[in-house]
Regions:
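Strand-connecting loop/turn motifs
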Residues: 49, 81-83, 96, 105-111, ...
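Residue-level detector of the transmembrane beta-barrel scaffold of outer-membrane proteins
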Residues: 53, 85-87, 111-115, 152-156, ...
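Flexible loop and strand-edge segments within Gram-negative outer membrane beta-barrel domains
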Residues: 119-138, 142-204, 208-217
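Short acidic/polar hinge/loop motifs at secondary-structure boundaries
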Residues: 5-57
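Transmembrane beta-barrel architecture of outer-membrane proteins
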Residues: 38-41, 70, 94-98, 134-138, ...
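N-terminal periplasmic accessory domains that precede
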Residues: 1, 40-44, 67-87
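Solvent-exposed loop/turn segments connecting transmembrane beta-strands
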Residues: 65-68, 88-98, 125-131
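Transmembrane beta-strand segments that form the barrel wall of outer-membrane beta-barrel proteins
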Residues: 77-78, 82-93, 112-122
């Protein structure tokens, strides 16, 4: 759940072809770590630099979170003014680059946030022939309307692309043509309205809509 919008993976029915295939002897069977069917959201696809708070609910959460029966992780991203921030990180496991900026137009009661993120991860530093690359882009807006009953509008558009790849090490006596690669591209659009009703039985009316399209192969 990101900014009140569930991340639904119910339609993901893909699994790795050739579950018994071994790309390199030290990596084990390919399907052991790549089959994510019925296992929830792949947390590697979520950029962390935009996160402001994280809430973890154990057990069966409220119905507002959707058809969840084993807990939920709620992520709230940064909103409003933030200075231009660029970050680069490199270690034995990953390389990461991030740039983001937030604007707040006080007169217009409008907040805008933009960010780009790139990650090149090496899950096992002993196996230099396997990597996981992720790139994300995000644009978010929040607008407050000064009416008798305050109205807040939220909009966001997010893109995530990943490449998961492994190939044989020619130094261990295997042919190089035996390789594994999967790509994933997702675009998600979310729109929300929150209307505060101070003098009625209903305190707040909330309407949220979202559209998500994925290309996974």
């Amino acid at each position: 759940n990101i900014d009140g919008v569930p991340l639904d993976v119910n339609s993901n029915m893909q699994s790795t072809v050739g579950s018994g295939m071994i790309i390199t002897p030290q990596s084990g069977y390919a399907d052991d770590k790549r089959n994510t069917t019925r296992s929830g959201v792949d947390m590697r696809t979520i950029a962390t630099d935009d996160i402001e708070t994280v809430e973890i609910i154990r057990g069966i959460p409220s119905v507002k979170f959707g058809d969840i029966s084993s807990g939920v992780v709620t992520i709230h991203r940064k909103k409003g003014y933030t200075p231009l921030r660029a970050r680069a990180k490199a270690d034995g496991f990953s390389k990461l680059f991030y740039v983001g900026k937030g604007f707040e137009l006080i007169e217009n009661r409008l907040k805008l946030n933009f960010s780009l993120d790139y990650l090149d991860s090496q899950p096992d530093p002993r196996n230099s022939f396997e990597n996981y690359k992720r790139y994300t882009a995000s644009a978010r807006a929040e607008k407050h309307f000064d009416t008798e009953n305050p109205l807040t509008w939220n909009f966001s558009i997010d893109y995530t692309g990943t490449i998961d790849k492994e190939k044989r090490d020619p130094d261990v006596g295997f042919d190089r043509y035996d390789a594994y690669q999967s790509t994933y591209n997702n675009i998600r659009i979310a729109n929300g309205l929150s209307w505060e009703l101070h003098k009625t039985f209903f305190k707040t009316l909330v309407l949220k809509t979202s559209y998500s399209q994925s290309f996974d192969r």
